[in-house]
Regions:
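Nucleic-acid substrate recognition interfaces
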Residues: 1-387
Length: 387
């Protein structure tokens, strides 16, 4: 089984400068390749393959104007050109939107490393082209330190290593193949109802609270709002005509705001991962969830912020990944399946059930929490389709 591993890097100032140079060269090569494809299409020419574009780019590298590209590893620009060609082809196949040019200000700095030439130890990683000579290549000072020791295995085959900068820290993500491990699963299954009041309610009566209602998150959200207001006032104060004069204090405040946003994101993602791991580690035979219409829920201005903070897409994505790792069958119920309106005792559908009705009351005498009943109905739905 192929697993993706992402680890934070701790580079020194010289290594940071080199990384930004690599990311800049990767962005330049991507934009150049995309511009060539667009120019060729407008002239009525056929699609240019990435192999042909790489040959053109090699000649460009050796010109006097772009001699600075010779200090960058060839594999960095080569993969960027390939990515641009893939994005361009995917648009015509109808798989994605038309590719955009990467902006220096708005795009995330990132670059590729050759999967054969990259080297890992328990504590460091060696990037291709970071050293000026073979002698310097052997020195530990030219290796970038990893924040988590022993997280990435050594002496294995690596796939698609990517280095990225999120505004605060540098990260490396790499795919590694692990042997498949078969888990002994239980005979019972679990139905999970996702919501806003509580993150998840399981059919075995286990409830996971909404982390956004905790004091820690509320305090960080308050600090975030204050910083946003302060930055907004600073912009208005330093406004000169139609442009803004960004002072050093504004830059400092924006960095603080970025740290708050990262902190909130990490808290929410960590809680989701812990919740999913706890559910999956029970080793049920199957897990059944509902196919939520998240885009439709986001159109409700009263619920959109709460829906966004819950991270339903991330929950489902991680659940799919962890279920496939453990060999658990994941069943997704139809979007129009009435899990909340269906009585778990008599099967009656209460069509006039409102979102404000937190307790389900049926004519048969059944009185139950609506989210808990939805999870029971999802488990029943999963039992029909479980293999």
């Amino acid at each position: 089984m192929v697993k993706a591993i992402k680890v934070m890097l701790i580079p020194n100032n010289v290594q940071k400068t080199k990384m930004f140079q690599y990311a800049g060269a990767s962005r330049f090569a991507y934009n150049w390749a995309l511009a060539r494809e667009i120019e060729n299409y407008e002239k009525g020419g056929k699609f240019i393959s990435d192999a042909e574009l790489r040959k053109e780019f090699t000649k460009l590298r050796h010109s006097d104007e772009y001699a600075w590209l010779l200090n960058i590893s060839n594999n960095v620009t080569k993969q960027a050109i390939k990515d641009a060609c893939t994005a361009y082809k995917n648009f015509f196949k109808g798989l994605q939107k038309f590719p955009r040019f990467k902006s220096k200000k708005r795009s995330m700095p990132k670059f590729y490393q050759d999967n054969v030439k990259i080297q890992f130890s328990n504590t460091h990683v060696k990037f291709e082209g970071f050293s000026s000579s073979r002698k310097a290549n052997k020195q530990k000072m030219n290796w970038v330190r990893l924040a988590e020791h022993g997280r990435i295995p050594t002496d294995v085959k690596y796939m698609n290593p990517r280095i990225s900068f999120d505004g605060l820290n540098w990260w490396i993500s790499v795919c590694v193949e692990f042997p498949d491990c078969k888990e002994t699963l239980n005979d019972d299954g679990v139905g999970i109802d996702l919501g806003i009041k509580d993150l998840a309610v399981c059919s075995d009566a286990v409830k996971y609270k909404n982390i956004n209602k905790s004091q820690k998150v509320k305090k960080l959200e308050k600090q975030k709002r204050r910083l946003q207001r302060s930055i907004s006032r600073s912009y208005e104060k330093n406004k000169k005509g139609e442009s803004y004069c960004k002072t050093n204090n504004v830059i400092k405040k924006e960095k603080l705001l970025l740290k708050r946003n990262h902190r909130l994101t990490n808290i929410r993602k960590n809680y989701l991962n812990q919740t999913i791991s706890e559910i999956v580690n029970r080793k049920p035979r199957f897990i059944c969830i509902e196919d939520l219409n998240v885009s439709g829920m986001m159109k409700n201005r009263h619920l959109s912020k709460a829906v966004q903070e819950q991270g339903f897409f991330w929950f489902r994505k991680q659940l799919e990944y962890k279920c496939s790792d453990k060999g658990i069958q994941l069943i997704v119920a139809d979007r129009f399946y009435p899990s909340s309106k269906l009585c778990s005792c008599c099967g009656n559908i209460k069509k006039d059930l409102k979102l404000s009705d937190r307790v389900y009351r049926c004519a048969c005498g059944n009185m139950i929490d609506r989210d808990f009943q939805a999870s029971i109905n999802l488990k029943t739905y999963g039992e029909k389709f479980a293999s």
